Amino acid sequence: VELQNRLSDESQ
C-alpha cells in the first residue's frame, strides 16, 4: 500500500 507507506514515512 503506497498510502500507508507514505503516512509511515511522514511520521518518521
Curated annotation (Swiss-Prot):
Transmembrane annotation, as ranges: none
GO cellular component: FHF complex; Golgi apparatus; microtubule
Any one GO molecular-function label of the UniProt entry: dynactin binding
Keyword DNA-binding attributed: no
Main location as per UniProt: cytoplasm
Keywords assigned: Cytoplasm, Cytoskeleton, Golgi apparatus, Microtubule, Protein transport, Transport
Compartments reported by the entry: Cytoplasm, Cytoskeleton; Golgi apparatus
Family: Belongs to the hook family.
Biological function: Acts as an adapter protein linking the dynein motor complex to various cargos and converts dynein from a non-processive to a highly processive motor in the presence of dynactin. Facilitates the interaction between dynein and dynactin and activates dynein processivity (the ability to move along a microtubule for a long distance without falling off the track). Predominantly recruits 2 dyneins, which increases both the force and speed of the microtubule motor. Component of the FTS/Hook/FHIP complex (FHF complex).
Protein name: Protein Hook homolog 3
Organism: Bos taurus
Gene that produces this protein: HOOK3
